[in-house]
């Protein structure tokens, strides 16, 4: 806010929960897609909405979340989930289709979705993973992970973050209800990283 007069930002939170993430391309059925969507919406206050509120407010800015409009959410959740499955070869097809015409340039309307982590740059994401590999040996990783019975880390990177958390918020891990991950019970979603970058269908996204 020190470098702009802009005080209000439009953000895209909740579009993933309503219309699908990259990983929901692998939903085994329309019913499974709908159940997952409902779960993600119930948990918004712990993840996306919380992140947006904190990261924007700390910079003395305000956010507007148009996809969070209650009437819009109810409308989209009432759509037959069969129509929301990615059978079109492009994620969030219904949302994109609704903005065809004079609303958005084609290059924006139909571009590939990029993972949230890509906003910090591919190199930083990869550098953090590589750095974590230098911090712990395999033996240290196994030993230190064993210290945690709740939300146990499962990669060296996640252990690094957990130990930073414990350093500043010792003994308060119980406030973390869940660790955001794709539905690992679904085909091709049993991954060790929450980023869509690790999914087989990520393709050219973010380029």
Where are these regions (language model features)?
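Cytochrome P450 catalytic-domain "roof"
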Residues: 1
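Adenosyl-5′-phosphate
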Residues: 4-11, 23, 29-207
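An acidic- and aromatic-residue-enriched active-site/binding cleft used to recognize and process polar
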Residues: 14
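Short catalytic/ligand-binding loop motif for oxyanion handling, primarily in non-cytosolic enzymes
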Residues: 17-21
């Amino acid at each position: 806010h020190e470098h702009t007069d802009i005080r209000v930002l439009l953000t895209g939170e909740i579009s993933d929960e309503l219309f699908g993430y990259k990983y929901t391309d692998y939903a085994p059925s329309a019913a499974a897609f709908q159940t997952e969507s409902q779960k993600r919406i119930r948990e918004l206050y712990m993840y996306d909405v919380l992140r947006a509120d904190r990261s924007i407010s700390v910079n003395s800015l305000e956010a507007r979340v148009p996809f969070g409009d209650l009437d819009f959410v109810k409308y989209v959740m009432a759509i037959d989930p069969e129509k929301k499955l990615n059978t079109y070869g492009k994620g969030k097809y219904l949302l994109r289709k609704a903005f065809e015409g004079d609303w958005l340039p084609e290059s924006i309307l139909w571009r590939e979705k990029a993972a949230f982590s890509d906003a910090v740059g591919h190199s930083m994401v990869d550098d953090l993973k590589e750095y974590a590999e230098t911090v712990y040996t395999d033996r240290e990783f196994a030993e230190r992970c064993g210290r945690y019975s709740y939300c146990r880390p499962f990669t060296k990177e996640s252990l690094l973050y957990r130990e930073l958390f414990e350093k500043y918020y010792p003994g308060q891990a119980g406030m973390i209800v869940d660790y955001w991950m794709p539905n690992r019970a679904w085909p091709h979603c049993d991954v060790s990283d929450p980023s869509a970058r690790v999914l087989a269908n990520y393709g050219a996204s973010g380029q």
